[in-house]
């Protein structure tokens, strides 16, 4: 079924699952996993940049990468920023992984022409510069 392509471990309940999109044209990355899960849970949770993502490569070079692995790396970086805000800067010292997931979902940018959550975009696109983290 082309609308249920997220598999283990991405379809597990407590994990953060990210789809991918093309920042240049705003479109969904063709090979991005789609949900919802067969049990009805929203997956992906949101989408992150996945096409022509510029980042570190081998031998001290920078390269462009395409794929949801790039989107997952960006999402991991966002999680690290939230953990720093919560734990290191002591804004939320009892932060859990569920708290991080909820912050990412709550902060996701939602396009006006889509309904959310949906099986392609989840709750929107990754955006960690949202108001709750600035307090």
Q: Which residue stretches match the model-derived regions?
A:
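Caspase-like cysteine protease fold
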Residues: 114-135
């Amino acid at each position: 079924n082309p609308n249920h392509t997220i598999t283990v471990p991405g379809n597990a309940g407590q994990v953060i699952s990210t789809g991918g999109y093309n920042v240049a044209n705003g479109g969904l990355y063709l090979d991005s996993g789609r949900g919802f899960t067969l049990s009805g849970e929203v997956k992906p949770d949101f989408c992150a940049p996945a096409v022509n993502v510029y980042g570190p490569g081998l031998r001290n070079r920078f390269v462009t990468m395409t794929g949801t692995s790039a989107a997952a790396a960006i999402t991991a970086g966002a999680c690290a920023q939230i953990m720093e805000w919560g734990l290191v800067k002591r804004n939320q010292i009892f932060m859990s992984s569920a708290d991080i997931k909820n912050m990412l979902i709550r902060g996701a940018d939602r396009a006006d022409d889509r309904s959310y959550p949906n099986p392609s975009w989840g709750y929107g696109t990754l955006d960690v510069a949202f108001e709750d983290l600035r307090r």
